[in-house]
């Protein structure tokens, strides 16, 4: 019998005899958002009080005097803007000592066990695209076939939503296309390897409900339910690509430095890796941090994924 681990609770529910979806929800620190479109719908409403028609309905559902605050076309444009942004890369300065530290830190990152959850690369294969079965996995489809369609907080984001009588075909975008902002990932041997440094799984990251890393609410449980107020210690593995531009650090942004995030934010299942990091010499710990600092968002238009501090390509294969 197989055991499923690291999947959020909503993806493990069996309803009326329908087996669990086992859908990975790669967004939000607790892994409860399926797609960029769902995330954008929620964020516009939660942070800005702007309501999308596809989630809240036509007209002026909140009665604030503003109609059609976000149309389906608006949400499609916002989503496509985000998913076609240039991917993060790596900056390796010209200083030989820093180069050596980054190389050593990358090896130590794996040695102490960080890479068991922060998996350096995950594949997009040519024969796995649920949104467009005839297309390879690097063809992005909008809307996502996994977008939620029911529930009080679930926008109806499938083609032809209930608020609109017109059914439009899914939009497809080749995420490796040179027409998109560079740098971009490329197909190598029929696979696009995504260096996101994650396993997209949920892990227990606290040592109990009193651990400062625990949260008082479990956002993977129904709002207002006993489970919701029971608290949460389980979080998705943070993507590390672009990490140097993403501070403050940790799942809740509690830590001002990467070192603090490692030392103070990795309990629970991450304890062994943290202890292994803390057992390194001070200079070795510095090397790990130097490697993490090299994972950066590159300026749009950068021609390759690995550059020096002047933006010059270091790996010819990435050009």
List the model feature ranges, each with a label.
Residues 1-319:
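Periplasmic c-type cytochrome electron-transfer domains
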